[in-house]
């Protein structure tokens, strides 16, 4: 299990060390979108930098993984740790908007994302890519990234590529749509716990 500590409201640091990966992630939900990403997987670094910028979540990630095997463990565990850190930073989730959605074009590509931070882990990812690998990241791991972050975050995430043929553009549109959906979902609106049950 990840070990977590909150250093200030809406901030968290989470670490996870296994025989496969050694990861630390620090973030602030009320940031400006600054980031420092070192996962060892070039394309994942690029996508997480974009996620940070467009969600306005300050994010620092360091991962040492068994890339001599492949990228699976690093991508999966980085997603789990980031999701866990966001969950810790949210605290009781009192006053958050909870839901967020976005539609993002990138040239010929179009992606849609919807998020519910209601405590139910589930992910649906619909995308087909023409390239098996891009900058060290297996494209089959894109869907697994979102499934894993949903698990760590205890969130319901739906992401779909609606159009496109350039693999880079399609995946980047997905991450940007997810970022904008998260930006909405984590924002503070007030009004207590956003659930008729009274808890999340």
Curated annotation (Swiss-Prot):
Chief place of localization: cytoplasm
CDD domains in alphabetical order: IGPD (cd07914)
Pfam family, one: IGPD
InterPro entries: IGPD_sf, ImidazoleglycerolP_deHydtase, ImidazoleglycerP_deHydtase_CS, Ribosomal_Su5_D2-typ_SF
GO molecular function terms attached to this record: imidazoleglycerol-phosphate dehydratase activity
Record family assignment: Belongs to the imidazoleglycerol-phosphate dehydratase family.
Name used for this protein in its record: Imidazoleglycerol-phosphate dehydratase
Organism of provenance: Chlorobium luteolum (strain DSM 273 / BCRC 81028 / 2530) (Pelodictyon luteolum)
